[in-house]
């Protein structure tokens, strides 16, 4: 995820990494309101929120309290994103085309640069605006320096001495081109390698106003680079503190909004009830008679939590609100859910194919991998609105039959008969239905594997993959590791809340 955030705040966070840990984390997330506020507003206005159960009595809140809560959510979300998303980067702000903000910005900037052009065209030239720009450039260059850059700091301070520049301007001795040359050279020294080309192009601009305009444009890009460098530098520091920080921020939100655990409670209650029902069915004696009260299965808090996390992989994101404590990772859980749905279809297709084909064909690694890649490619757009699973499975059936026939021919085995082709195509097309037995078996085994992995404490090696899932073992293990990381981090942050809720639920049950 990349966000359009305030660069200077994140940059300062990088400089503060040697300070107190709590202050460092506060600095890292300071000033992020604008970028994430839209997500908060859209979530609060979503129809899903209308369904909130009122387990806590309603109370009136002030606008200030709401804004403070929003800021807390924003800062917590940003800290979480930096820690959880290893690819997190800030990107330059790009205003939408033809938007009011973009037009206003262009008008204001044009007026400013036109004014500068007029001043420099006077006889003698007026350098008031130009000197202010040099001052801004000086501060920006100094902000890029680390504490050990003493020589560069002295050079910038000496050459871009505003008092001396003003005196030279008053005496008609100011060489603005010489200052620009020094600035470009210093930018080349401080910029990231990715900006070398942009800095090099500045040397080809001869007119002062266009040159200054492009200098500021490149400096903005360098600010983004510096902010991302700061984030990568402080990420290990944030990892150590983020659990306490997120828990603290959530507690502050909970104190302002006492009903902020309603959906979590509902989520854990459902998980407990579902798990109890499953265990009770398994505990029934042969013949279906009810077991005695002493034989009733008992649930552990850990088992309920793990099962609750598995339920997130079958969530109806359009109809049901996501539990509050996992809301920041909703997109990640949803992405894993989509990956597992695709793996389920892929695994089911491969299972019926290898079951119908000649014995031993699945043991040919090259063929199995080739067939998997073909099906995988055809399922790539599975979750796009324009994707029609039935039609694609028809195409997959045709392609699979061709590949199987070709493989059998090369191996010298008996040819794949027309009757077998018809049956195989029919079984592959049947996978389109969520109630298809093969598809349900694959889904159940995948969830069992994930549950076993969570229960094992994420130890290596991973649990043995259930039967029928060997062709998709690598993909399944990758998903399992991502899923376990999300779950583990969420548990570390919110375990005290889960324990408190489950202690009441399990006593009642």
From Swiss-Prot:
It comes from the Eukaryota. One of its GO terms (cellular component) is microtubule. The keyword NAD does not apply. Keywords: Phosphoprotein. One of its GO terms (biological process) is signal transduction. Residues 21-33 have a biased composition (Acidic residues). Residues 1-60 are annotated as: Disordered. The modification Phosphoserine is found at residue 56. The keyword Ubl conjugation does not apply. Coiled coil: none annotated. InterPro entries: Tcp11. Belongs to the TCP11 family. This is T-complex protein 11-like protein 1. It comes from Homo sapiens.
